UniProtKB/Swiss-Prot annotation:
Its cofactor is Mg(2+). InterPro entries: Beta-RFA-P_synthase, GHMP_kinase_C_dom, GHMP_kinase_N_dom, RFAP_synthase, Ribosomal_Su5_D2-typ_SF, Ribsml_uS5_D2-typ_fold_subgr. It comes from the Archaea. Signal peptide: none annotated. Keywords: Glycosyltransferase, Magnesium, Transferase. This is Beta-ribofuranosylphenol 5'-phosphate synthase. It is an enzyme of class 2 (transferase). Pfam families: GHMP_kinases_C (PF08544), GHMP_kinases_N (PF00288). GO terms for molecular function: ATP binding; beta-ribofuranosylaminobenzene 5'-phosphate synthase activity. It comes from Methanothermobacter thermautotrophicus (strain ATCC 29096 / DSM 1053 / JCM 10044 / NBRC 100330 / Delta H).
Length: 329
């Protein structure tokens, strides 16, 4: 009998990195939101050969990126557990790579979890991340995979990590989570992913970290104040106006300001359109190009305003997801 295992994992917004100065003895730190949509669904079956197929539509370049990440994560996991099994993976649902929604971490962790489950082995999300080499800068993707929700991570001690590097180039362990709260179910999140060629990954991403860091300590202190004394209380109190204001303030502070400056001017126009349409707050996820806004009423107005100016791309109206990845079967 052929046994198929299937996993569902979320996407995430990465609102900002916190400390790219390091003077206080820690680096990185991050804030993020787990999303209901888009989601990743991947299946696994034992096979005579390793392979990956797709039942969801995707262009060739995206398929190759997914295939490469799946094969690498499977190889590392099999090596870790000492198995020579072979598997056929089926990607049933997917979302764009290098768009700011965290597909790389989710795909690697999903693959590792499937391989481990097949062998009857249980690992935490942090353990899986260590196996497949994810979470070396931001812990938001790993924490989203584990428990979902609104997340703040603590970054890394300078004793473990002394260089300014993105997660894809860092061997550090996933950082501890400082806070994890349920994201208010009544809040809508509107995501816009314009088709622009400004994705940042690989060597270019490493170069950006090396060129712009360390950032001034005053930027880190201001950002920390916004997060601790405005954004986190807003989540706990359900105050969407204060939450939106904190998102807006983050856009011109610290590393987020640099990420925004490196993007296409269309990003600024989309964010402005979201605010003008009534969203209390709007910003860019990670290096983009995904842009997001939050609102508790008339999300269609915000989505419509974006559609008028964005051109080719995708608009998603969704919400926060307060659970992590789960096995469908």
């Amino acid at each position: 009998m052929v046994i198929e295992l299937i996993i569902n994992t979320p996407s995430r917004l990465h609102l900002t990195l916190i400390d790219l100065n390091g003077e206080r003895g820690r680096l990185d730190g991050g804030v993020g939101i787990t999303l209901n949509e888009p989601e990743l669904v991947v299946g696994l079956e034992a096979s005579d050969d390793m392979g990956v197929e797709f039942t969801s539509h995707a262009e060739g370049k995206l398929r190759e990126e997914y295939r490469s990440k799946i094969m690498e994560a499977a190889r590392r996991t099999l090596k870790h557990i000492g198995s020579d099994e072979k598997f056929h993976f089926t990607v049933r649902s997917m979302f764009p790579a290098h768009s700011g929604l965290g597909s790389g971490t989710q795909l690697s962790l999903a693959t590792a979890r499937l391989v481990a489950e097949y062998h009857g082995m249980k690992f935490t999300a942090r353990e899986l991340a260590h196996i497949v080499g994810r979470g070396g800068t931001s812990g938001i993707g790993v924490a989203s995979f584990e428990d979902g929700g609104f997340i703040v991570d603590a970054g890394h001690s300078s004793r473990e990590k002394s260089d300014f590097l993105p997660s894809s180039a860092s061997s550090a362990s996933p950082p501890p989570v400082i806070a994890r709260y349920d994201f208010p179910e009544e809040w809508n999140i509107i995501i816009a992913i314009p088709e622009i060629d400004r994705s940042v990954s690989g060597r270019r991403e490493v170069n950006i970290f090396q060129e712009y860091c360390p950032l001034p300590l005053r930027d880190v202190e201001r950002l920390s104040h916004i997060i601790l004394m405005k954004m986190m209380p807003a989540i706990l109190e359900g105050d969407i106006e204060a939450f939106g204001e904190s998102v807006n303030e983050i856009q011109g502070t610290g590393f987020k300001r640099i990420e925004r400056e490196l993007q296409d001017p269309l990003i600024d126009r989309i964010i402005d359109s979201m605010i003008s349409a009534g969203a209390p707050g709007a910003g860019m996820s990670s290096f983009g190009p995904a842009v997001y806004s939050v609102t508790d009423e008339k999300p269609g107005n915000v989505a419509g305003a974006v559609a008028e100016i964005m051109g080719p791309g995708r608009i998603i109206v969704t919400g926060g997801r307060n659970r992590g990845a789960f096995m469908i079967k």
